[in-house]
Regions:
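Conserved donor NDP-sugar-binding/catalytic core segment of glycosyltransferases
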Residues: 1-38
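Alpha-helical elements of Rossmann-like donor-binding domains used by nucleotide-donor carbohydrate transfer enzymes
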Residues: 3-7, 80-84, 120-123
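A recurrent flexible, glycine/aromatic-enriched loop bordering the glycosyltransferase active site
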Residues: 34-56, 72-74
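A conserved hydrophobic position in a structured secondary element of the catalytic/binding core
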Residues: 51, 77, 95
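Short, well-ordered alpha-helical scaffold segment located
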Residues: 54-59, 99
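Catalytic beta-strand/loop signature of glycosyltransferases that borders the donor
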Residues: 63, 89-103, 113-114, 133
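Acidic donor-binding loop at a coil-to-helix junction in glycosyltransferase catalytic cores
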Residues: 68-83
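Non-catalytic, C-terminal membrane-associated alpha-helical segments of glycosyltransferases
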Residues: 112-175
Length: 175
């Protein structure tokens, strides 16, 4: 795995960040080497991300402490990090090489697809994407993930809680 990562940076010397694939988690990214678009950053989990440390330090980029496990605000810290990097103009590539296996352990924050989960999803989405785009993404999320949560909450219940999280705007960064 280390050799795959080093070779990718050797082959892509202008890359600041490279997103890889995982052995046991299908990706929604294209199966080729390319520069993903902004919204594709929402399809990435943290264990897929590698970066040049100097690029992150030089651009004063950090993971947002308001998001992630332990914050009570929901997940998405890796997506916000990638979007911040994208907005700063860093070169972010996807290389369809599998570098790791994601082990499924008990989550420190996910307790099921309940009203609170969807509320926090709306809250973090608003914080990351702003109001307009978060409303559109919230609708997309409720529809596209329906098969995963339909035993726990209705699509209307999920959407209602997502929109409540978006409108309450408790993280108050983006308008």
């Amino acid at each position: 795995c280390e050799q795959k990562i080093l070779k990718a940076y050797e082959d892509l010397p202008d890359a600041d960040i490279i997103i890889f694939d995982l052995h046991n988690k299908p990706t929604k990214l294209k199966p080729k080497i390319y520069l993903p678009k902004r919204l594709e950053m929402l399809r990435v989990c943290s264990c897929q991300i590698t970066f040049k440390r100097a690029s992150i330090i030089d651009n004063k980029l950090i993971f947002d402490v308001k998001l992630g496990a332990g914050t009570g605000n929901g997940a998405g810290e890796e997506n916000k990090f990638l979007l911040d990097c994208y907005d700063k103009g860093l070169k972010i590539y996807h290389v369809p090489e599998k570098i790791a296996v994601m082990t499924e352990n008990e989550s420190t924050w996910f307790t099921g697809f309940d009203a609170d989960f969807f509320y926090k999803q709306g809250m973090s989405t608003r914080y990351i994407l702003g109001f307009g785009l978060s409303c559109t993404y919230g609708l997309y999320y409720a529809i596209s993930k329906h098969n995963q949560y339909k035993k726990d909450i209705s699509i209307f219940g999920a959407l209602k809680n997502i929109l409540s999280g978006i409108f309450d705007n408790k993280l108050t960064k983006k308008i």
